[in-house]
Amino acid sequence: MKADLVSGLLPIREDGCMLLLQRPTGTWEPPAGRLQPGESFEEGAVRELYEETGVLVSPQRIIATWVGEAASGRPLASVTYAGRTDRAEVRLSEEHLDHRWVTLGEWMSLPSWWSPENIKRIAGPVETVRIVGAVREPPLPSLREDTGVVTANLGAGAVLVDLGGVEPRALLLRRRKPPVGLWENPGGMLEEGEDFEACARRELFEETGVRARIEDAWWARVEPWRKPEDPELYAGVGFLARHQGGEIDPEATAHDAAQWVTETEWHTLRTWYTRRESDVLWKAIKEMEP
């Protein structure tokens, strides 16, 4: 499944109020827009926020993902971040009618593409960013020529976490296919009608035989699909999932071994992830409620 990529960034003040912008249609949404070529989800979110409001905020946590259709009928895939700010002044772009700093409750009373259920779902992540997020301004985003939409093949996966021991453990599966021997978490490509969460849930069950609740997204990436010079792009989102019991039964055609590993053990194995990404993952795992 392919879709045009969108990224957003919700600024959060110390008092818990969030910045929403009123679009010409009258709805109130977090600052967001389409990615430009060469951007990551985070870079696109920072640029869009700055272009639309003049505010600089560092993305500190993914609070929502979405896959659906634009008003034009084109498929869209979006990742929304949150970040702390101490700025109150907003330089509104001509694309918008107004702006407001609102609470979650006030947001739910406004017309919005976000449903009340989806707004309620971000209450926990938003509160975490408000309490522990540091106010950090990123560098000024690079000026990029608007060369049209960025379309990518969509994928998702989940790191299955066991919180029942002395320290958290995560499940890794060893690949049978190239790169043979690499350790990875369950994941794959979206099928028609799926969003990122549904894909992660299905892939987790298909590759482990375990059904688990998909929790927070901890990672999102845009990169060349099959090789560095590939003109086609891949856009993936990684989630956490809580192991609630059941024996791991690896899909035999894809993996030849499975093991539960601690953070220390994870870093000794060859995975898809950089050290920085692994550190972000384990920070998110440690923040999961027992």
Say what each PLM segment does.
Residues 15-17, 71-74, 163-169, 228-231:
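Short, solvent-exposed loop/turn segments that connect beta-strands within catalytic domains
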Residues 1-8, 130-159, 163-165:
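Acidic, metal-coordinating catalytic segment for phosphate/diphosphate chemistry
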Residues 3, 26, 75-77, 152, ...:
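Residue-level preference for beta-strand/loop junctions
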Residues 11-13, 22, 85, 160-162, ...:
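Residue-level signal for short segments within beta-strands and strand-turn junctions
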Residues 35-58, 66-117, 121, 190-213, ...:
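Unchanged
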Residues 117-141, 276-290:
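Charged phosphate-binding loop/patch that engages nucleotide di/tri-phosphates or the phosphate backbone
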Residues 8, 17, 98, 157, ...:
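Conserved beta-strand and immediately adjacent loop positions that scaffold enzyme active sites
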Residues 14-51, 166-206:
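Conserved Nudix-box catalytic region and its N-terminal flanking loop in Nudix hydrolases
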